[in-house]
Swiss-Prot record:
InterPro entries in the record: MENT (IPR029292)
Keyword Signal: yes
Protein name, entry field: Protein MENT
Domain of life according to the entry: Eukaryota
Range of residues in the leader sequence: 1-23
Gene Ontology, cellular component aspect: extracellular region
Tissue: High expression in testis, but low in other tissues.
Subcellular locations according to the entry: Secreted
Main localization (coarse): secreted
Keywords assigned: Phosphoprotein, Secreted, Signal
Organism, as annotated: Mus musculus (Mouse)
Pfam families named in the record: PMSI1
Gene from which the chain derives: Ment
Length: 350
């Protein structure tokens, strides 16, 4: 412990002496000071060593300036670290693909400060677009330094995402969608403004008006003992939906046939004897024939009984239900004729 303290004191004295001598010799012999220089370094824990210059003329001609440097183990480690720093930076640049000067600050990274292997993050502090792209293991040469980059990127595999473009897309408002949504207010309400109906669309039932045409001629059905006639109609306010002749049989009327209107066989009594449906002359001419054939009742009269001619006026209830039955038959015939005729037309238009 004592020799070390003595050596430290002696080194301090030498340094002060040579510093004063150097200040005096700086004005007289500046060249000699720069030509010959001796560096003496003392290291604790070992003998002092002197690093002399290899120039023999500097030893004999001009006394050189002596510089004393005190070093310990920590200074040696710091010097070694400083000398190894460029080599470490070089090794880091060859492994990761970016130099030490281009390493961003820790605030630019994520909270944990980690980065996945094989991914180079070029994010900046500005609000510009963020570009993330994966690396490919292709070797590229640098023209300035001659180093080989382990990870070089190609333009074909870059994936860029613009954050500002996403925010700008959300500001676009579809006016057409808002106008259609405003047509409906609360659930259960009716839409306010509807589009104008086209001319080819089906009009509302209030706009349709049926005009009945005159009755057609009687059609005799001698085998069934009936005759029928039909009445056509026209729809005003409807165009292009029904073919011509679709409403030719809008109403159909069925009645027992008469020999005055139908050329049926009287001997077979195909038509019933009804005084209300024939004139007095025709009924009187058939009177003897009727008396001779009272025992034979035709089959169609059994299936379809009629009121006897002796009753002057039927009961009001029977007359009412008869009118109801005739009205229902007319409605059924009109509906069946309309829908059977319009069904193929609507199928074609669809």
């Amino acid at each position: 412990m004592v020799p070390a303290a003595c050596m430290l004191l002696w080194a301090l004295l030498l340094s002060l002496e040579y510093r004063a001598a150097g200040a005096e010799d700086q004005t007289t012999t500046p060249t000699a000071t720069t030509i010959g220089m001796q560096r003496v370094s003392f290291r604790f824990g070992g003998p002092a060593r002197s690093l002399h210059s290899t120039n023999p003329t500097a030893r004999t001609t001009v006394p050189g300036k002596l510089r004393v440097t005190l070093e310990d183990e920590n200074d040696a480690l710091a010097t070694a670290d400083r000398l190894a720093l460029p080599a470490a930076a070089e090794l880091l640049s060859t492994v990761t693909g970016y130099s030490r000067s281009s390493v961003p600050s820790p605030s630019d990274w994520e909270e944990d400060g980690s980065l996945e292997e094989g991914v180079v993050d070029t994010r900046k502090t500005t609000n510009g677009p963020v570009s993330l792209f994966s690396t490919t293991n292709t070797v590229g040469s640098s023209g300035t330094t001659g180093r080989f980059l382990a990870n070089s990127q190609e333009r074909e595999i870059k994936l860029t995402t613009d954050v500002r473009s996403l925010s700008s897309k959300t500001t676009v408002v579809d006016l057409s969608s808002e106008s259609t949504l405003q047509q409906w207010s609360t659930p259960g309400s009716t839409p306010s403004p509807w589009l104008k109906p086209s001319f080819t669309a089906m009009p509302s039932p209030e706009d349709l008006r049926v005009v009945l045409m005159p009755w057609g001629p009687w059609h005799c059905h001698c085998k069934s003992g009936t005759m029928s006639r039909s009445r056509a109609g026209k729809l005003h306010g409807l165009s292009g939906r029904l073919r011509v002749g679709a409403l030719n049989e809008l109403r159909t009327e069925h009645r027992p046939c008469t020999y005055q209107l139908c050329a049926c066989n009287r001997h077979l009594e195909e038509c019933p004897l009804d005084s209300s449906l024939c004139s007095d002359h025709s009924c009187s001419s058939r009177a003897p024939f009727q008396s001779s054939t009272t025992s034979l009742v035709p089959v169609h009269l059994r299936r379809r009984p009629i009121l006897p001619p002796t009753s002057p006026s039927p009961s009001p209830a029977l007359a009412f239900w008869k009118r109801v039955r005739i009205g229902l038959e007319d409605i059924w015939n009109s509906l069946s004729s309309v829908f059977t005729e319009t069904q193929p037309v609507e199928r074609i238009q669809r």
